[in-house]
Amino acid sequence: MNNIIDGKALANEILADLKLEIQELTSQTNASPKLAIVLVGDNPASIIYVRHKIKNAHKIGIYTLLINLSATIHTNDLISKINELNLDNEISGIIVQLPLPSSIDKNKILSAVSPSKDIDGFHPLNVGYLHSGISQGFIPCTALGCLAAIKKYEPNLTGKNVVIIGRSNIVGKPLSALLLKENCSVTICHSKTHNLRSITSKADIVVAAIGSPLKLTAEYFNPKSIVIDVGINRISSNKIIGDVDFENVQSKVQYITPVPGGIGPMTIAFLLKNTVKAFKDSLYTLDT
């Protein structure tokens, strides 16, 4: 049954376009985008994610600077390091890899990144732009990846009923803003929602982002459902699964993303797309 939304293939299309765009920009300006990645501590999952980001960046011509810092670093010292990157004109975008150690004030760190280099879209100013409907700044990459995957198979979203399970600042909240802009009717559910199954089973599109392995079984969906699984649940050193019971759900819905190979590659593709946007914005700033 060919109803799998191949996030890897979609991401590769985006990356191919970005590679050509970077080549053209480099030939015109004799400069290239550069991405700074701040990694605090030695969380094994974070190390893997960073490795994927660097690998894909290099493939398309984005230079990277990886800054490894001790998990014992103080919040103020980390802010000082971020400020150095903010002031470095060669750096187009900055990522602070999450999660951070519990001793660090995450909100202070995310607010320290310059909004013009905040390619994750987590700075309060960029969050405000998104939820105010202002077409400026950066939007969180996983939300962008989800929307692109949905629109590939359902280009006209006007009037669609969408249920998002998860209310995080990374996925649930930004995606709800994007879908409202597409004229969807959006319901956000979470761990305290009652009768979740009765809500999701009536939806045209269900986005699962709760971090609960295989939580959503076939009964949560209908035959016309488009299912976007954002869950990344590591069950061993080399195996991850989603929030949706993919094996039993796939044949009972219209379209579904796998884990891995679904939204993960799309997230990286849009992260790099945001990096190129930041690079182009910086060129414009230097010209004015």
From Swiss-Prot:
Pathway involvement of the protein, from the record: One-carbon metabolism; tetrahydrofolate interconversion
InterPro entries: Aminoacid_DH-like_N_sf (IPR046346), NAD(P)-bd_dom_sf (IPR036291), THF_DH/CycHdrlase (IPR000672), THF_DH/CycHdrlase_cat_dom (IPR020630), THF_DH/CycHdrlase_CS (IPR020867), THF_DH/CycHdrlase_NAD-bd_dom (IPR020631)
Binding site for NADP(+): 166-168, 191, 232
Signal peptide span: none
Keywords, in A-Z order: Amino-acid biosynthesis, Histidine biosynthesis, Hydrolase, Methionine biosynthesis, Multifunctional enzyme, NADP, One-carbon metabolism, Oxidoreductase, Purine biosynthesis
Chemical reaction(s) catalysed: (6R)-5,10-methylene-5,6,7,8-tetrahydrofolate + NADP(+) = (6R)-5,10-methenyltetrahydrofolate + NADPH; (6R)-5,10-methenyltetrahydrofolate + H2O = (6R)-10-formyltetrahydrofolate + H(+)
SUPFAM superfamilies for the chain: Aminoacid dehydrogenase-like, N-terminal domain (SSF53223), NAD(P)-binding Rossmann-fold domains (SSF51735)
Enzyme nomenclature, EC number: 1.5.1.5, 3.5.4.9
BP GO annotations: L-histidine biosynthetic process; methionine biosynthetic process; purine nucleotide biosynthetic process; tetrahydrofolate interconversion
An annotated GO cellular component: cytosol
Short name of any one Pfam family annotated for the protein: THF_DHG_CYH_C
Molecular function (Gene Ontology), one example: methylenetetrahydrofolate dehydrogenase (NADP+) activity
Subunit structure: Homodimer.
Family label: Belongs to the tetrahydrofolate dehydrogenase/cyclohydrolase family.
Protein purpose: Catalyzes the oxidation of 5,10-methylenetetrahydrofolate to 5,10-methenyltetrahydrofolate and then the hydrolysis of 5,10-methenyltetrahydrofolate to 10-formyltetrahydrofolate.
NCBIfam families found in the cross-reference section: PRK14171.1
Protein's name in the database: Bifunctional protein FolD
Organism annotation: Rickettsia africae (strain ESF-5)
High-level lineage: Bacteria, Pseudomonadati, Pseudomonadota, Alphaproteobacteria, Rickettsiales
